Amino acid sequence: MKVLHVLNSRIYSGAEKVVCQIIKSFRGEIEMVYCSPDSDIVRQMLAEQNVTYLPMKNMSVSELRRVIREQKPDLIHAHDMRAGFFSALCCGKIPLVSHIHNNAYDARGLSAKTVGYLLAGFQAKHILWVSQSSFDGYAFHKLFAKKSSVLYNIIDTQQIFDKKAQDSHTYDYDMIYVGRLTYQKDPQRLMRLCARLKQEKPDLNVAIVGTGELLEEAQTLCESLDIQENVHFLGFQSNPIKMVADSKAMILTSRWEGTPMCALEAMALGTPVVSTPSDGMKDLLEDGVSGYLTEDDEQMARDLLKIFADPEHRKYLADNAKRKFESINDADAYKQAIADCYN
């Protein structure tokens, strides 16, 4: 059996990690290949993991049909709505599995995106949703209830600790952010939060790992808030795991989320997570027990300052988060759910 994974992105972040994880978990059992618009970063990360990469000039019907003709897959696994739409246009009689990785705001009402995804929804033999909220949030979800299931993300724990061991550096960050700098992630809010924290902790040390269309805007705001000595924009990092492990806290200020891979990694590593109560995060964290969830910036600052100052409290949160992580991170069940969709 040959499976073609189709993505619309040129980045390497959460959904892209999920796809590589799926491909590696079926290695030796099912042939799988990764197809997306051409990207140097994706090419580099897939080469490191020995994952076959099929770059396209762009996401278009002609390019995707070319790949399908050349590869002759037995099944197409399309990730997120735009890739699902184009895959539905191109797949013909080839079975299609659609996989939605977040609960995007623009999927909640009547829009070109929600209407366009109807084609993929009707064409797909099965639809996987990263959280219950991502399913409930889609405007026309009731039409596809019988062919839908929720599949929360997991991570390869051994791989995480292997990556940690590969980095011999020691880091001294109070707080780390790992992810794209986009509207979804609200990096402007993150900058304002850092400025608030600096008022109480002048030596605040923050790492920002990632790139995105709002990078320059975030950097400009950082300078205008006079926190450029405290906030370090590190760009894309192929292995930020040791940075996460050494940080006192991980921060997420997202407007919406699925099940963030970075949060799962932090939980496994024992780094407390402080987040807005967005979608999948509410399934991962219990406020004040295994991390913090709040929509209020002042409360978020207080929670973070407590984590920075109190090692015992940090350990309490970390231990509870590790227990929660171990209870939900079932790699065998995840793999079986994927196999059931294919079969």
Predicted regions and their residues:
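N-terminal strand-loop element at the rim of the active site
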Residues: 5-59
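Conserved acidic donor-binding segment of nucleotide-sugar-dependent glycosyltransferases
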Residues: 287-298, 306-311
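Short hydrophobic beta-strand element within catalytic cores of glycosyltransferases
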Residues: 272-275
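A short, well-ordered alpha-helix in the C-terminal region of glycosyltransferases
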Residues: 313-328, 337-339
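Short His-centered aromatic/hydrophobic patch
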Residues: 78-84, 100
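Acidic anion/phosphate-binding donor-loop and adjacent secondary structure
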Residues: 139, 150-172, 238, 242
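Aromatic "clamp/platform" in nucleotide-sugar-dependent glycosyltransferases that forms part
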Residues: 236, 255
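A conserved mid-protein helix/loop that constitutes part of the nucleotide-sugar donor-binding site
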Residues: 13-24, 177-196, 213-220, 261-264, ...
